[in-house]
Amino acid sequence: MPIKVQNRTLKPGQLNVTQKTYDNIVLQQLRELWTNYGTLDEIWFDGGYTTSLKDPITALLTELQPEAIAFNGYGVSLNSARWIGTEMGIAPDPNWSTGITNDGGDPNSSIFCPAECDTTLQNKDRWFWGVNATLRSLSELIQVYHETVGRNCLLMLDLTPDRTGLIPPAYARRYKELGDFIRSCYGTSVLPMENLISDDSLEYIQLFVSSPVTVDRSVIQEDQTYGQVIRSYIVDVKLVNTTNTHQWMIVAQGTSIGNKKIDLWQVGPLLINAVRLTITKTVDKPVIKSFTVHLCN
């Protein structure tokens, strides 16, 4: 993205352009990119923009791509997303949907600016294709998924073509392996949402089943249409054993939910006949978009 022109140490072949001329070139190039390639889902401001370009870029975005998410775009777009602060594929826990700092956000901020986690398929933080580049293992990518998407962070996993302009077959296979895992693990809940009871305030949701099932993780999604309002929660399950079929046990608890929170139960797979989500702290009436449990081998 645009930078400030520095003409004090020009090298042979460099033009001595003014900041005004440079800004004009940038704006013309942005108009071309934002006009000739259809509707854009996301625009990256990787490195920011100069003060002199802030207002012109804001106007251009509003005119040409008003619905696009603007990565690092706070100040020029209302649809901004913030950087999580690392390219390793891990978000802090908790990770809030509000705040503009490059970290886990701020639950007390009035600025809605969800985080994006960008990382590479190749090892050693390598973004561009290389002849001898190696790929991250499937197990590592699964961990990346849980520590980004599962922590309320949008995952942007690098997609790099080779010198033919195509995605190498080995790369495509690794992407598919990750997709297959996500679909097989999280595609269907062991306890469907139809088997649900809740109180009028929606501060707790309980899933139940007539025959015991084995599960090892839970997924919560908060409806953030009017903001992120949940501040803490507990997930507990009703165990099935030979001595007491009515024993409740806490398997997960946390603070931020946001778009998605995946809790891998440290106690491992459990045989249960009910699971309950209790919202223990909220700043407004909570709306749970989804609450599911799963068993993943």
Question: Which positions does each model-derived feature cover?
Answer:
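Mature catalytic domains of secreted/periplasmic carbohydrate-active enzymes
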Residues: 1-269, 278-296
